[in-house]
């Protein structure tokens, strides 16, 4: 029943028909309104009132929800963050001037991955749109499944960053998920062929919002040509993706999706960078979580993360760049050392570092300022922020050109110097834009006086109209000689000159009659008419002219977007180098050595995060690993003693070294690591029905299938989620597998409570035992946090329970049970009379199952350290061939006393 709808409602339904899977924000005067099902959704999600207006197509009352237009920045992010797409349908003309219904149209579609408003994301993170193109290959992978070939691209339209890569080997799926974890896109688009792959979409949805996009975009042979047209190049070879079919498909899909949603040319997206996974250390989602690289495990915030600990950056660009570096440590010593050189110079030259960081404090988010300028969403305040940021560049440039000794800092200085024209842009903004302009660009008050003579005149007319009228009246009295002449105004006739009939003979010839009154005539002159138009419209024209001037300035800035973005990138890099130098000085870090061999040698290593949070000082520890004698470190010791911290700090020091950062140690040499694997902690995956043990085994399988001789593996308490026999068997098999993998095995740190594993040091030549030193003082237990060679024979479980605050009655009962189990172990063991061999009863087997460590009292003898009870130890010392009958009887009484 469209005939009962208003013209505005027809416009709404036309927009909804064009964007059926999108919520519509429909501009109606001072509000954005939504109707029907959209209104119900918006009211629910935004917790606003749902009302009704008019009638829908069926004649029923139409549900309505609306928000004030000026509050869109508050409400829109809430919908986007929940995964909705929102189409903004604006009024395309001034309602006051509209003839009939106001023209309206969708001006942009906001999605999680194409948001440009700063209120929708953090300055510290990129807001990536991810596009995946690919197909199922003909070959089978390791486990018999079909291999997949993938090209993936990441586009941040708020900064202009555009990246692409392609996977062509058998680990495509795992690498795709690793990239997903590292890049953390806000949205991912897939062609129907991949969208229908439930395994792929399921994994993607664990990390991001997944959308299906037009199939023809992902597979078109014209993708390469369209990319070349966009970038204005003749070939994609310079971007490195000319021969990467799926990388090109995914890149064009991402760009086309962004253009479709933004409905404009994305001129600030002016380059595409192709990267390879062989350039960076792989850190999968499990490792990122376990090592807390950028987020902590507790609440997924950045507090107590490595990123937060090292972050002394002063700019948003530096903030984001630091996070990228931490997520992608380098594999090339030649690329790492220039970073270390620059950090060393800035750490040593405290005055230069102080000046740089002081200047950087005035730099705003140039990348996103440029994005808003190009999109036409910038405010005058954004231009002032850009001006202040560009104003810092000469100081940074000149200081570095004068003092920089190492190549990386010199390159930054030369890059900043190559865009000296940017100073002209800052000067243009300084001359044109008020220092403290209003928020809106549509209400005037942002252009300085003196910039535009026309604008100055309009402002003068608007603010001085009364003075001008008075002066005009006096001038006309003198010219005509009519002393009673006056200038008046009414809404019907506008401004007029009024002359009484008595003085009509003195009216000048250029006066034009406008109205005859009973006692007077009203006239106007061309000058008065012109001024009338100016006076009546001066303010309106002034506001319009201001916006026109502002738009012209932004067009000039947009034309220099590439130079501005490259400047922002250099500033971000400099900020990170200065930040890491500051962290070095604040935390007493040292420069690591990077090598191509498999050695890891750390002296006095410290956990960078833990040492910044603990009081009383952090106990440093050494780590020595190589491919000859120390490839596999088996670490034993009680809970809470610091095994996990020690393993994590070793990995974090290696990661920091390959990032190009100084490290918390007195000395560190790291052989390049291609991937860090971790199996630490217990996490149930209840959503998919996986127990702690199942999760552990899945993660372990990933490690064993993918670790290489250049990897570093951290394993903590493997096998604890099942029976002790099963767990021990799995743990031992894992040690043997990693030790024997390839010619030199895989570097690994393995923390365990299975004491029997320490015997592997005698059987496997590259396994070395270490343990955490503990000091006992009566019932007190002191963790010394020091890693020392050799195995421990104690678990101290009951001691740890006491430290944790377990009630003393429970502690006492636990000790009683422990003693009973020890006695049971002796009493249940008997001789097999037929073959003379010992056999264990079921009770003894149960006891052994529970006590792979010997957790007895602190006064055990050296014999007990070998796994013997007091009775067994005493018996071991007895030589029956040398005893008399009476001595044997006395010894039997002694043994009985030992049994209590």
UniProtKB/Swiss-Prot annotation:
Annotated GO molecular function terms are: ATP binding; ATP-dependent DNA damage sensor activity; damaged DNA binding; double-stranded DNA binding; mismatched DNA binding
User: Is Transmembrane helix among this UniProt entry's keywords?
Assistant: no
Instruction: Give the InterPro entries listed for this entry.
Output: DNA_mismatch_repair_MutS, DNA_mismatch_repair_MutS-lik_N, DNA_mismatch_repair_MutS/MSH, DNA_mismatch_repair_MutS_C, DNA_mismatch_repair_MutS_clamp, DNA_mismatch_repair_MutS_core, DNA_mismatch_repair_MutS_N, DNA_mismatch_repair_MutS_sf
Xref: SMART domains? MUTSac, MUTSd
Annotated residues that bind ATP are located at 637-644
Keywords on record:
ATP-binding, DNA damage, DNA repair, DNA-binding, Nucleotide-binding
Transmembrane ranges, per UniProt, are none
Keyword Lipid biosynthesis listed: no
Tell me which Gene Ontology terms the entry assigns under biological process.
mismatch repair
Q: Which family does it belong to?
A: Belongs to the DNA mismatch repair MutS family.
State the protein's purpose: This protein is involved in the repair of mismatches in DNA. It is possible that it carries out the mismatch recognition step. This protein has a weak ATPase activity.
Q: Which NCBIfam families match?
A: mutS1, PRK05399.1
Q: Which PANTHER family does its entry note?
A: DNA MISMATCH REPAIR PROTEIN MSH1, MITOCHONDRIAL, DNA MISMATCH REPAIR PROTEIN MUTS FAMILY MEMBER
What name does UniProt use for this protein?
DNA mismatch repair protein MutS
Q: From what organism does this protein derive?
A: Methanosarcina acetivorans (strain ATCC 35395 / DSM 2834 / JCM 12185 / C2A)
Provide the gene name from the record.
mutS
């Amino acid at each position: 029943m469209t005939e009962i709808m208003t013209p505005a409602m027809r416009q709404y339904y036309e927009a909804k028909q064009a964007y059926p899977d999108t919520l519509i924000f429909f501009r109606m005067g001072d509000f954005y309104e939504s109707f029907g099902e959209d209104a119900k959704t918006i009211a629910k999600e935004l917790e606003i009132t749902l009302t009704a207006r008019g009638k829908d197509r069926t004649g029923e009352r139409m549900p309505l929800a609306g928000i004030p237009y000026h509050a869109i920045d508050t409400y829109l992010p809430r919908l986007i963050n929940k995964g909705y797409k929102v189409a903004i349908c604006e009024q395309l003309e001034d309602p006051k001037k509209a003839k009939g219904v106001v023209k309206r149209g969708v001006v942009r579609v906001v999605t999680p991955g194409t948001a440009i408003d700063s209120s929708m994301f953090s300055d510290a993170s990129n807001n990536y749109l991810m596009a995946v193109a690919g197909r199922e290959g003909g070959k089978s992978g390791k486990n018999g499944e079909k291999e997949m070939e993938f090209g993936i691209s990441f586009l941040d339209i708020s900064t202009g960053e555009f990246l692409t890569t392609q996977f062509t080997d058998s680990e495509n799926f795992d690498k795709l998920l690793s990239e997903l974890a590292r890049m953390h896109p806000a949205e991912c688009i897939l062609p129907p062929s991949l969208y229908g792959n439930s395994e792929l979409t399921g994994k993607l949805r664990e990390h991001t919002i997944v959308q299906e996009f037009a199939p023809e975009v992902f597979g078109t042979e014209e993708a390469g040509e369209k990319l070349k047209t966009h970038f204005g190049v003749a070939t994609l070879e310079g971007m490195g993706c000319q021969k990467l079919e799926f990388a090109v498909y995914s890149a064009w899909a991402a760009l086309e999706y962004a253009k479709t949603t933004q409905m404009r040319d994305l001129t600030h997206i002016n380059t595409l960078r192709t990267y390879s996974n062989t350039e960076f250390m792989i850190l999968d989602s499990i490792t990122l979580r376990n090592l807390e690289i950028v987020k902590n495990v507790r609440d997924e915030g950045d507090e107590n993360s490595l990123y937060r600990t090292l972050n002394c950056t002063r700019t948003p660009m530096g903030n984001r760049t630091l996070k990228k570096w931490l997520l992608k440590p380098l594999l090339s010593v030649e690329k790492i050392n220039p970073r270390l050189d620059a950090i060393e110079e800035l750490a040593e030259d405290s005055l230069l570092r102080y000046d740089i960081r002081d200047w950087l404090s005035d730099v705003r988010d140039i990348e996103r300022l440029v994005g808003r300028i190009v999109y036409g969403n910038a405010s005058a305040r954004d231009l002032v922020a850009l001006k202040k940021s560009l104003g810092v560049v000469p100081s940074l440039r000149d200081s570095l050109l004068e003092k920089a000794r190492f190549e990386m800092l010199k390159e930054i200085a030369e890059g900043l110097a190559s865009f000296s024209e940017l100073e002209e842009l800052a000067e243009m903004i300084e001359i044109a834009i008020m220092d403290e302009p209003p928020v809106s660009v549509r209400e005037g008050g942002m252009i300085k006086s003196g910039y535009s003579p026309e604008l100055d005149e309009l402002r003068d007319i608007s603010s001085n109209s009364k003075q001008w009228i008075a002066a005009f009246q006096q001038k006309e009295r003198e010219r005509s000689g009519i002393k009673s002449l006056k200038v008046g105004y009414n809404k019907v006739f506008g401004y007029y000159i009024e002359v009484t009939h008595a003085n009509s003979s003195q009216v000048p010839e250029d006066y034009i009659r406008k109205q005859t009154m009973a006692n007077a005539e009203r006239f106007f002159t061309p000058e008065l008419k012109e001024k009338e138009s100016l006076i009546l419209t001066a303010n309106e024209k002034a506001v319009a002219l201001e916006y026109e001037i502002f738009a012209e300035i932004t067009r000039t800035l947009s034309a220099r977007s590439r130079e501005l973005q490259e400047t922002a990138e250099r500033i971000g890099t400099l900020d990170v180098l200065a930040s890491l130098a500051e962290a070095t000085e604040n935390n007493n870090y040292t420069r690591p050595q990077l090598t191509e061999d498999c050695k890891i040698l750390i002296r006095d290593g410290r956990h960078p995060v833990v040492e910044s949070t603990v009081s009383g000082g952090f106990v440093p520890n050494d780590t020595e690993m190589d491919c000859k004698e120390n490839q596999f470190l088996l670490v034993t010791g009680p809970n809470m003693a610091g095994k996990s911290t020690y393993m994590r700090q070793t990995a974090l020091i290696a990661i920091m070294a390959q990032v190009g950062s100084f490290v918390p140690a007195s000395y560190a040499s790291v052989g390049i690591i291609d991937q860090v694997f971790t199996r630490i902690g217990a996490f149930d995956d209840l959503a998919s029905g996986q127990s702690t043990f199942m999760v552990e085994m899945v993660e372990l399988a990933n490690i064993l299938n993918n670790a290489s001789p250049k990897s570093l593996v951290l394993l903590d308490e493997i096998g604890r989620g099942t029976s002790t026999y099963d767990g021990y068997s799995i743990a031992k098999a894992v040690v043997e597998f990693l030790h024997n993998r390839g010619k030199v095995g895989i570097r690994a740190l393995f923390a365990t409570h299975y004491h029997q594993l320490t015997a592997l040091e005698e059987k496997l030549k590259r396994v070395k035992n270490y343990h955490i030193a503990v000091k006992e003082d009566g019932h007190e237990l002191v963790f010394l946090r020091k890693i020392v060679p050799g195995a421990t024979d104690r678990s101290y479980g009951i001691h740890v329970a006491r430290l944790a605050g377990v009630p003393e009655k429970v502690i006492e009962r636990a000790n009683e049970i422990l003693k009973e189990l020890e006695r049971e172990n002796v009493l249940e063991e008997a001789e097999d009379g037929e073959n003379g061999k010992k056999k264990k009863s079921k009770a003894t087997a149960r006891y052994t199952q529970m006590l792979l460590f010997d957790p007895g009292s602190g006064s055990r003898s050296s014999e007990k350290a070998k796994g013997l009870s007091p009775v067994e130890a005493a018996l071991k010392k007895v030589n029956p061939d040398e005893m008399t009958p009476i001595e044997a009887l006395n010894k039997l009484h002694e043994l009985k006393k030992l049994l209590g």
